[in-house]
């Protein structure tokens, strides 16, 4: 059946900002879909609020709307296209995660799709409802001959209590229509039931929750299926969770294909999955079904289904080489599976199910260290911020590779000291699921626990425990062997052990370098295998490789020779984490595509299954490998061999993937690997405070006073000389890890005690903290001679809030022409002083007309995608070309950069773009169930970002808030409680809110000051003050929890009562999903946003249209 001829214009909805539970896997799927639809001659409109995505680059759609993903904004897009005589025929919402699906459902139910004649494709409304609505899905499972957990959908707390009495405790609480398990959990007591179900009823857009029997401890499996309009169904992949039920699948280590299912169990699961898919009615696309198996009696139940492309779909795509999103998009426009050719083989159709001759392991990356006080227990609510994936010829090889891919402080077994305690302590820790469980499993086995005892304590299947036990046995052999011979070393490498791990067991080999030289001497190198979807039955056309150490010394590598073009290796950024996310992947993808077009063979090395960079057709070759020195060096050697007799490897790019590749630059250069762009010595110069300070002094550029300390006494002396407040931090960090603003000696002592353990080989830096300064961020290019300013951003929050968490505006809103010229001159001096070839990011603080240099990073920054979208200049592409020898003058002549001028001075008619950070506070709870503090500081906490772009600052800021957190209130009550130093600055914004008709609530001191300034307000007492006669009966926290407050303005100060009170206020706001503003500047911006919303003139415009207005570079 050829594609439908009645479809001409398709609207694709993306997934918005990166949040826990919904990450860049949807950029990967959306990018594939847009490419496919346009290749089929269809017109594509795209709505996505996330500027860091590849899919929002103007070349992927005809009309790219970087707008909030809400029903109201999407309706404006549909209406605008209809008004222009360019009617949208269909809406594809199955590739943008839960956000897109919920938006599509709302548009259908409100009649918008019917009004404009837009058809839902991929999955129709009924299929979405049947798959997502818990009760309807349960009925379908029964009809298909399957079984669900005993459960009931409840709409009120009374129904919840009645159901719990019937099922008995513990129970699982699950809201409908949410993603990443948000609001779900296992309740062991009636108090926990009340708390979770109450929160669940609030979290679910349909205001109902499912209460089900607990199947905690059962084995969990997933099937990834696809179905076409002719009822052909393929099972793309089976996935097994190593962690048992009770841990969200996104937080579990997972394996593909499933390892512990019998053939009979698998066939039963497969038959049931296909029957459910048909009953639900997903007739043109992909879906994911989760199952649980009772390990004691084999009882199989169906947990849930996602009638859309999901996180697991991205994993299954990368694991098998079967491009699920791409095929889903083709199925949605009418093709059948037998008509679609498998890209990887070039000859088999998509109705051939993938076959794997390797094992894939995915492991989650957490960030609990960023949220002090958060409960680290793993539950049914997802908490991981990223993931890594690896491929190997056996389970333990893939496991070893994925553990070192995570880049945590422990790079695999035996690379860090064991925790205190013996077997019993390890087994006790295993009973509560937490990050790093694999280490406790290995430790318990090594200390003598049996496989059965460890399986009983952890709930992990004995097969996986036995595999880790084999590693423990191998460790004993490695330690005991008199000499490490070729056979034993080869077995160790075949079992996934790194040189670093082997070196930790054999001290006489003098570290990792000693193991490497022994390996080289014995001729032990990895071979590179190919992901081909068919277990080598057909030849692969796409070079997608993974390494393996074969036991047979004669095993051959599958990397084909390529001698025509010079090669460039691009090192990706590894698993997403706070501080290093999709923004860096964006730059890597741009480098791959632009250098390929410029005549280079591009080679991508990365291990993140969610990203566009690890798509098999982004670079000319892909290596799915850990980003460690050992693994990258082996890839380099493989590429040198494959290019032997040709131009060879021109160099390795380390400055686009964030701190991970930068950290490898020196060791790679020392090993003879050519690094292109800014040399490693220059990177060091920018990181070394002494050398960088000298550079600034020579250029006459002021910087905040600072000192370097290795002891508390030194830090105290420096702080006294500089004057409090001071900013303290370890050196060499990304995302402000371990940074704090310290107001007194007592807090300083506490910090030094904690932070010096964080990076023992580097001292602590103590800087003067510039209060009330305006922070400025600059992205620039330098070719060694000329400097091109990409964009100058003004932060909305004051200096002291991490740049990744601060909202910022481009072009700057309050900076004058002379300020901008100061910034330009300083940036030029720094670029030349460091010796930058490529991108440079500099952060400044402007205070009392003095421009202070805070830091400079000679690499791609996380703002590069935002600046590129806002200015229409592809900075990452330009950077890649400059690193490989192009000049800025040459790129101007080619039209890649503006012919004259640069991004320092925006055109008069340029729109204002606002970037806002998206923070995951609502995902975390303290152990007692309380919310964690939403206070911002110098340590980065955001997981993603959105962009609002419009004619004026107020409208752009309002859009950014709507996209990140939901609309700012247009009326209602605002609660104000601020530190004394902020009271004067807040008079004007609060007065404006009162004039707009808002009721103002305030605590006693703030209320008194507001009334003195003619602002009517009502008093509430502070949370820690007791209720007394003559005082307000309601506290601020009571008012927020009672739903009487629509917005909170709360600025904190110090560590005493007000600080604690502030924590309670902000936590209550987070729990109630109420806008909570913690800075004066944020309050002023919010007022402008509210005014823009009340005026009602916030429209939508595509990037293509905006870029024409800017007069930007059209590509």
UniProtKB/Swiss-Prot annotation:
<feature type="binding site">
    <location>
        <position position="729"/>
    </location>
    <ligand>
        <name>ATP 2</name>
    </ligand>
</feature>
<feature type="binding site">
    <location>
        <position position="220"/>
    </location>
    <ligand>
        <name>ATP 1</name>
    </ligand>
</feature>
<feature type="binding site">
    <location>
        <position position="770"/>
    </location>
    <ligand>
        <name>ATP 2</name>
    </ligand>
</feature>
<keyword id="KW-0460">Magnesium</keyword>
<protein>
    <recommendedName>
        <fullName>Carbamoyl phosphate synthase large chain</fullName>
        <ecNumber>6.3.4.16</ecNumber>
        <ecNumber>6.3.5.5</ecNumber>
    </recommendedName>
</protein>
<feature type="binding site">
    <location>
        <position position="843"/>
    </location>
    <ligand>
        <name>Mg(2+) 3</name>
    </ligand>
</feature>
<feature type="binding site">
    <location>
        <position position="246"/>
    </location>
    <ligand>
        <name>ATP 1</name>
    </ligand>
</feature>
<dbReference type="InterPro" id="IPR036914">
    <property type="entry name" value="MGS-like_dom_sf"/>
</dbReference>
<comment type="similarity">
    <text>Belongs to the CarB family.</text>
</comment>
<feature type="binding site">
    <location>
        <position position="304"/>
    </location>
    <ligand>
        <name>Mn(2+) 2</name>
    </ligand>
</feature>
<feature type="domain" description="ATP-grasp 2">
    <location>
        <begin position="693"/>
        <end position="884"/>
    </location>
</feature>
<feature type="binding site">
    <location>
        <position position="290"/>
    </location>
    <ligand>
        <name>ATP 1</name>
    </ligand>
</feature>
<keyword id="KW-0665">Pyrimidine biosynthesis</keyword>
<feature type="domain" description="MGS-like">
    <location>
        <begin position="966"/>
        <end position="1113"/>
    </location>
</feature>
<feature type="binding site">
    <location>
        <position position="800"/>
    </location>
    <ligand>
        <name>ATP 2</name>
    </ligand>
</feature>
<feature type="binding site">
    <location>
        <position position="304"/>
    </location>
    <ligand>
        <name>Mn(2+) 1</name>
    </ligand>
</feature>
<keyword id="KW-0677">Repeat</keyword>
<keyword id="KW-0055">Arginine biosynthesis</keyword>
<keyword id="KW-0464">Manganese</keyword>
<dbReference type="InterPro" id="IPR013815">
    <property type="entry name" value="ATP_grasp_subdomain_1"/>
</dbReference>
<keyword id="KW-0547">Nucleotide-binding</keyword>
<dbReference type="Pfam" id="PF02787">
    <property type="entry name" value="CPSase_L_D3"/>
</dbReference>
<feature type="region of interest" description="Oligomerization domain">
    <location>
        <begin position="408"/>
        <end position="559"/>
    </location>
</feature>
<feature type="region of interest" description="Carbamoyl phosphate synthetic domain">
    <location>
        <begin position="560"/>
        <end position="965"/>
    </location>
</feature>
<dbReference type="Pfam" id="PF02786">
    <property type="entry name" value="CPSase_L_D2"/>
</dbReference>
<feature type="binding site">
    <location>
        <position position="803"/>
    </location>
    <ligand>
        <name>ATP 2</name>
    </ligand>
</feature>
<feature type="binding site">
    <location>
        <position position="306"/>
    </location>
    <ligand>
        <name>Mn(2+) 2</name>
    </ligand>
</feature>
<dbReference type="GO" id="GO:0046872">
    <property type="term" value="F:metal ion binding"/>
</dbReference>
<feature type="region of interest" description="Carboxyphosphate synthetic domain">
    <location>
        <begin position="1"/>
        <end position="407"/>
    </location>
</feature>
<feature type="binding site">
    <location>
        <position position="843"/>
    </location>
    <ligand>
        <name>Mn(2+) 3</name>
    </ligand>
</feature>
<keyword id="KW-0028">Amino-acid biosynthesis</keyword>
<feature type="binding site">
    <location>
        <position position="855"/>
    </location>
    <ligand>
        <name>ATP 2</name>
    </ligand>
</feature>
<dbReference type="InterPro" id="IPR005483">
    <property type="entry name" value="CbamoylP_synth_lsu_CPSase_dom"/>
</dbReference>
<dbReference type="InterPro" id="IPR033937">
    <property type="entry name" value="MGS_CPS_CarB"/>
</dbReference>
<dbReference type="InterPro" id="IPR006275">
    <property type="entry name" value="CarbamoylP_synth_lsu"/>
</dbReference>
<dbReference type="GO" id="GO:0005524">
    <property type="term" value="F:ATP binding"/>
</dbReference>
<feature type="binding site">
    <location>
        <position position="306"/>
    </location>
    <ligand>
        <name>Mg(2+) 2</name>
    </ligand>
</feature>
<feature type="binding site">
    <location>
        <position position="855"/>
    </location>
    <ligand>
        <name>Mg(2+) 4</name>
    </ligand>
</feature>
<feature type="binding site">
    <location>
        <position position="290"/>
    </location>
    <ligand>
        <name>Mg(2+) 1</name>
    </ligand>
</feature>
<dbReference type="GO" id="GO:0006541">
    <property type="term" value="P:glutamine metabolic process"/>
</dbReference>
<feature type="binding site">
    <location>
        <position position="290"/>
    </location>
    <ligand>
        <name>Mn(2+) 1</name>
    </ligand>
</feature>
<feature type="binding site">
    <location>
        <position position="304"/>
    </location>
    <ligand>
        <name>Mg(2+) 1</name>
    </ligand>
</feature>
């Amino acid at each position: 059946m050829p594609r439908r001829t009645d479809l001409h214009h398709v609207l694709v909805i993306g997934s918005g900002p990166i949040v826990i539970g919904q990450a860049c896997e949807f950029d990967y799927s959306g990018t594939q879909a847009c490419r496919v639809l346009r290749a089929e001659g269809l017109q594509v409109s795209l709505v996505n609020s996330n500027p860091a995505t590849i899919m929002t680059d103007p070349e992927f759609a005809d009309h790219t709307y970087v707008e909030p993903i809400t029903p109201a904004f999407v309706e404006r897009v549909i209406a605008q296209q209809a008004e222009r005589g360019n009617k949208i025929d269909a809406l594809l919402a199955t590739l943008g995660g839960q956000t897109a699906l919920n938006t599509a459902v709302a548009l259908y139910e409100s009649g918008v799709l019917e009004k404009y004649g837009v058809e839902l494709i991929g999955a129709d409304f009924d299929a979405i409802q049947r798959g997502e609505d818990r009760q309807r899905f349960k009925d379908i499972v029964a009809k298909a001959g399957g079984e669900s957990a005993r459960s009931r959908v409840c709409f009120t707390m009374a129904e919840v209590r009645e159901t719990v009495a019937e099922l008995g405790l513990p129970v699982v609480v699950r809201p409908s229509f949410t993603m990443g398990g948000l609001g779900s959990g296992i309740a062991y007591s009636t108090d926990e039931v009340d708390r979770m179900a109450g929160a669940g009823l609030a979290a679910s857009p349909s205001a109902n929750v499912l209460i089900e029997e607990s199947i905690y401890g059962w084995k969990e499996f997933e099937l990834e299926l696809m179905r076409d309009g002719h009822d052909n169904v393929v099972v793309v992949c089976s996935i097994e969770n190593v962690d048992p039920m009770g841990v969200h699948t996104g937080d579990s280590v997972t394996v593909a294909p499933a390892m512990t299912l019998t053939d009979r169990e698998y066939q039963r699961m497969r038959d049931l999955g296909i029957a459910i898919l048909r009953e639900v009615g997903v007739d043109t696309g992909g879906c994911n079904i989760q199952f649980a198996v009772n390990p004691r009696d084999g009882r199989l139940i169906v947990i849930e289904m996602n009638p859309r492309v999901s996180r697991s779909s991205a994993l299954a795509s990368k694991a098998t080489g079967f491009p699920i999103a791409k095929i889903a998009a083709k199925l949605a426009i009418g093709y059948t599976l037998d008509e679609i050719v498998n890209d990887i083989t070039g000859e088999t159709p998509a109705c051939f199910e993938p076959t794997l001759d390797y094992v894939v392991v995915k492991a989650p990356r957490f960030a609990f260290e960023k949220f002090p006080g958060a409960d680290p227990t793993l539950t049914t609510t997802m908490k991981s911020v990223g993931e890594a994936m690896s491929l190997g010829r056996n389970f333990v090889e893939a496991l070893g590779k994925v553990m070192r891919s995570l880049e945590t402080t422990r790079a695999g077994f035996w690379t860090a000291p064991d925790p205190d305690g013996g077997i019993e302590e390890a087994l006790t820790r295993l009973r509560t699921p937490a990050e790093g469980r694999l280490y406790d499993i290995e430790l318990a086995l090594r200390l003598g626990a049996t496989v059965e005892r460890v399986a009983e304590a952890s709930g992990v299947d004995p097969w996986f425990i036995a595999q880790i036990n084999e590693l423990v046995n191998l460790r004993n052999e490695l330690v005991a062997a008199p000499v490490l011979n070729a056979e034993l070393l080869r077995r160790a490498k075949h079992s996934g052990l790194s040189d670093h791990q082997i070196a930790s067991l054999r001290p006489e080999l003098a570290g990792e370098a000693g193991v490497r030289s022994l390996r080289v001497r014995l001729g032990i190198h990895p071979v590179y295998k190919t992901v081909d979807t068919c277990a080598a039955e057909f030849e692969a056309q796409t070079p997608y490789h993974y390494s393996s150490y074969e036991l047979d010394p004669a095993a051959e590598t599958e990397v084909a020779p390529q001698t025509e073009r010079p090669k460039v290796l691009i090192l990706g950024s590894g698993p997403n984490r706070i501080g290093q996310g999709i923004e860096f992947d964006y730059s890597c993808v741009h480098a791959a595509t632009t250098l390929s077009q410029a005549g280079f063979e591009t080679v991508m090395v990365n291990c993140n299954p969610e990203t566009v960079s690890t798509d098999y057709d982004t670079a000319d070759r892909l290596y799915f490998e850990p980003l460690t020195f050992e693994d990258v060096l082996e890839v380099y050697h493989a590429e040198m061999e494959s290019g032997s007799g040709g131009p060879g490897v021109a160099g390795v790019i380390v400055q686009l993937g964030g701190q991970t590749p930068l950290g490898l630059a020196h060791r790679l250069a020392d090993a003879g690997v050519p690094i292109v762009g800014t040399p490693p010595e220059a990177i060091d110069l920018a990181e070394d405070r002494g050398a960088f300070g000298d550079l600034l002094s020579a250029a006459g550029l002021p910087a905040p006073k600072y000192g370097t300390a290795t002891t508390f006494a030194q830090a105290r002396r420096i702080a006294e000389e500089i004057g409090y407040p001071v900013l303290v931090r370890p050196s060499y960090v990304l995302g402000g890890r371990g940074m704090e603003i310290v107001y007194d000696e007592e807090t300083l002592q506490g910090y030094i005690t904690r932070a010096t353990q964080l990076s023992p080989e580097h001292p602590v830096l103590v800087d003067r903290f510039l209060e009330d300064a305006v922070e400025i961020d600059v992205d620039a290019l330098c070719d060694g001679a000329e400097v091109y300013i990409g964009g100058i951003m003004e932060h909305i929050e004051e200096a002291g809030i991490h740049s990744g968490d601060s909202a910022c505006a481009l072009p700057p809103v309050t900076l004058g022409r002379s300020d901008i010229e100061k910034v330009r001159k300083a940036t030029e001096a720094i670029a030349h002083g460091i010796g930058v070839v490529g991108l440079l990011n500099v952060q400044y603080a402007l205070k009392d007309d003095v421009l202070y240099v805070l830091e400079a990073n000679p690499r791609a920054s996380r703002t590069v995608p935002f600046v590129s979208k806002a200015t229409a200049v592809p900075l990452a592409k330009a950077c890649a070309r400059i690193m490989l020898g192009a000049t800025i003058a040459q790129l101007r002549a080619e039209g890649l950069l503006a012919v004259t001028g640069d991004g320092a001075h925006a055109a008069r008619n340029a729109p204002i773009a606002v970037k806002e950070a998206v923070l995951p506070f609502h995902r975390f709870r303290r152990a007692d169930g309380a919310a964690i503090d939403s206070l911002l500081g110098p340590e980065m906490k955001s997981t993603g970002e959105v962009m609002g772009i419009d004619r004026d600052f107020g409208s752009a800021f309002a859009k950014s808030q709507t996209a990140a957190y939901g609309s700012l209130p247009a009326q209602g009550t605002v609660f104000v409680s601020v530190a004394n130093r902020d009271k004067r600055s807040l008079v004007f914004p609060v007065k404006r809110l009162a004039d707009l008709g808002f009721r103002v609530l305030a605590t006693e001191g703030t209320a008194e000051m507001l009334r003195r300034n003619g602002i009517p307000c009502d008093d509430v007492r502070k949370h820690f003050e007791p209720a007394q006669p003559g005082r307000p009966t309601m506290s601020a926290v009571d008012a927020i929890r009672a739903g009487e407050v629509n917005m909170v303005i709360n600025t904190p100060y110090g560590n005493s009562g007000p600080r604690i009170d502030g924590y309670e206020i902000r936590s209550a706001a987070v729990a109630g999903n109420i806008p909570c503003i913690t800075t004066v500047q944020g309050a002023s911006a919010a007022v402008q946003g509210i005014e823009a919303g009340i005026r009602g003139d916030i429209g939508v415009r595509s990037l293509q249209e905006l870029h024409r207005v800017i007069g930007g570079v059209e590509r």
